[in-house]
């Protein structure tokens, strides 16, 4: 059981890193903040399509990561 959870955790970590790297950047960094990128801050645009799917998948994979970590720590006791 412990080995199965560790394998699931490794798969989840790889998937989480992949999904985060597939997402587009949402800001221009520090240069956008200095040169007046406030319209991006206050004029929030809705996410659609692939961006929305990747955002939700990131949240699900992150929650799964924490659940698996709690399971591993519980079984390790």
From Swiss-Prot:
Compartment(s): Cell membrane
Protein function: Involved in protein export. Participates in an early event of protein translocation.
InterPro entries attached to this UniProt entry: SecG
Membrane topology type: Multi-pass membrane protein
Domain of life: Bacteria
Species assigned in the record: Staphylococcus epidermidis (strain ATCC 35984 / DSM 28319 / BCRC 17069 / CCUG 31568 / BM 3577 / RP62A)
Protein name: Probable protein-export membrane protein SecG
Entry GO MF terms: protein-transporting ATPase activity
């Amino acid at each position: 059981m412990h080995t199965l959870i560790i394998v699931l955790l490794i798969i989840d970590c790889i998937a989480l890193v992949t999904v985060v790297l597939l997402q587009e950047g949402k800001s221009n960094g520090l240069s956008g903040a200095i040169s007046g990128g406030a319209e991006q801050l206050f004029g929030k645009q809705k996410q659609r399509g692939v961006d929305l799917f990747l955002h939700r998948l990131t949240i699900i994979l992150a929650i799964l990561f924490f659940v698996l970590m709690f399971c591993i720590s519980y079984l390790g006791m």
